Amino acid sequence: MDVNPILLFLKVPAQNAISTTFPYTGDPPYSHGTGTGYTMDTVNRTHQYSERGKWTTNTETGAPQLNPIDGPLPEDNEPSGYAQTDCVLEAMAFLEESHPGIFENSCIETMEVVQQTRVDKLTQGRQTYDWTLNRNQPAATALANTIEVFRSNGLTANESGRLIDFLKDVMESMDKEEIEITTHFQRKRRVRDNVTKKMVTQRTIGKRKQRLNKRSYLIRALTLNTMTKDAERGKLKRRAIATPGMQIRGFVYFVETLARSICEKLEQSGLPVGGNEKKAKLANVVRKMMTNSQDTEISFTITGDNTKWNENQNPRMFLAMITYITRTQPEWFRNVLSIAPIMFSNKMARLGKGYMFESKSMKLRTQIPAEMLANIDLKYFNDSTRKKIEKIRPLLIDGTASLSPGMMMGMFNMLSTVLGVSILNLGQKRYTKTTYWWDGLQSSDDFALIVNAPNHEGIQAGVDRFYRTCKLLGINMSKKKSYINRTGTFEFTSFFYRYGFVANFSMELPSFGVSGINESADMSIGVTVIKNNMINNDLGPATAQMALQLFIKDYRYTYRCHRGDTQIQTRRSFEIKKLWEQTRSKAGLLVSDGGPNLYNIRNLHIPEVCLKWELMDEDYQGRLCNPLNPFVSHKEIESVNNAVMMPAHGPAKNMEYDAVATTHSWIPKRNRSILNTSQRGILEDEQMYQRCCNLFEKFFPSSSYRRPVGISSMVEAMVSRARIDARIDFESGRIKKEEFTEIMKICSTIEELRRQK
């Protein structure tokens, strides 16, 4: 399609063309190799920003720790992490004064959550550092391994199923002199294959017990594993992100619950809302500042950028905030909430896989694991790496680096937002006590600041005061990257505001196209994305129609399901043509079976099966929606499914789409190669969980699914449920006396076996 791109912009206002400058088409960059270098950068930078703090040594782990809190006040514009405790506490007090009861109410809400949350909350989330195996695992597996180790070491509070009880075990585990864990390992041996008579390598998986002393266990419990952040657009350099272990996660969850509850009550907070709700919140603040500045005042807005937000934040400051916020609350609650920041003050960063070396002349490759960096000869490294290693060496213990100052990415988004909002709150005239005043928006490290004043000097003074206030709380507004405009034009969290929000359509580009789940889900997701963009992102009818046609084309090429009457030859065309010829009502065939596309922009909300149902041949209906079809392994499909969309910025979003179960909703089988690796034990565990959960679901079908209340194990819940159901069935005559007696006997046997165990 040859279009002169200039033509596209003839009628477009300049501000709407902003989205064409975004780096969102094509594949995002991914990282390859190890993240060790990026992690060392993070650790070294963080220490540099706090270098004038006080050094101490952790008595338990022997880790050297740097504490910049209440350090020297900055004399230049360089980023620094010297937050002042009294300033932070005062900012909190003023925040509470402007919002009476906000902390009290949020604490009460959080206390309820703390008492009700179950351990399985921690199974959400993707990769988690598994301290028992010293590497990353899916969250559910990491949690299971942790609980298994706890129980074998006599820590059993977690059996109640409440998260708070699991956390009691975590606390107790840290006092134990030693902890015994089970690790997986691989044995390789060379054997001769009976058939081919060649030598092959045979792998066997073993489990062995290992004892960790208190120091080693504490180091693991406080470790954050690091990885490289993938798919970041518009950056030349990659950066490291952290994933904490199960000991830290539960505590962080409660702190963030409290902070989220506070953020919900703050009009300047861009979290936890998103999308249109966030835009409405934003527009309100702008409107407030514009209305108050009509005649006498001028109003300017800074599109703000902070330098290295995470690396200058400090867990000790968060501890001070929590201590203040919960000051009127019961002791147990204050203790639970203060543990996360204390653990972060003592955190260790795992350096990842280490470095790969290869010798061109000898065709050799070897991996230098992170553990060896402490004492390897540095002559093998290039200059920049050598400098990094020299700098980090004093901090190393067992391949992890002591990292007391700074927060790793994404850990306390809500709480750090509360800190940012507390500065915006200080912009009211009753606090500035002068002619200028400010307000704004904060969302994690991103902010927009609106300053009003009678003249330009006032604006400048206001910005300066804001900048210096930030410095006192360990926040560094970047003078190079922030820019100021007349109010009415600014950007905040990639929303562009120009007398109202301009749709930044380019950010949605990556989600257009075929997702690659299966034929049924992909069709549904594809049209839902187009529908959502018509609702939220100014996608006009003509463009939407074109997007739809391109999507169908893309879909047909992906699944090789071109129309039955086409000339295109693919691997499937023989079957599809045959189906086309024997179908009476060809309009009823799904696109994935070579049928025509009946979608247009008016009916995007209807699942394709429903759209075509009346047009289908009867035998086609029978084949399409037949749960007994032997060629399909069905999972039970909810009426609404969730796809994980990767928008251009921010976390992966859950997108709902309608799902109708057909023979096209297949699930690919698991790759076999995993069965030969040390992951195999984990896979078997997962299957066991799956079976247990399926069994549980049979006893508590979703229609009557209430979580068993009170403290009972899954087995106890199922046995008592079986007894109740059996009695009802017997009394209503649905089962005979013999069957009833047999069920009761089985239940008693199960209980007896449990007692003996």
From Swiss-Prot:
Domain of life, source organism: Viruses
Compartments, as annotated in UniProt: Host nucleus; Host cytoplasm
Listed EC numbers: 2.7.7.48
Biased composition range(s): Polar residues? 55-64
Q: Where is this motif: Nuclear localization signal?
A: 187-195, 203-216
| Gene Ontology biological process terms, A to Z | DNA-templated transcription; symbiont-mediated suppression of host gene expression; symbiont-mediated suppression of host mRNA transcription via inhibition of RNA polymerase II activity; viral RNA genome replication; viral transcription
Citing just one GO molecular function, the answer is: RNA binding
Q: Which InterPro entries match?
A: RNA-dir_pol_NSvirus, RNA_pol_PB1_influenza
What family, per the record? Belongs to the influenza viruses polymerase PB1 family.
Q: What is the protein name for this chain?
A: RNA-directed RNA polymerase catalytic subunit
Species name = Influenza A virus (strain A/USA:Huston/AA/1945 H1N1)
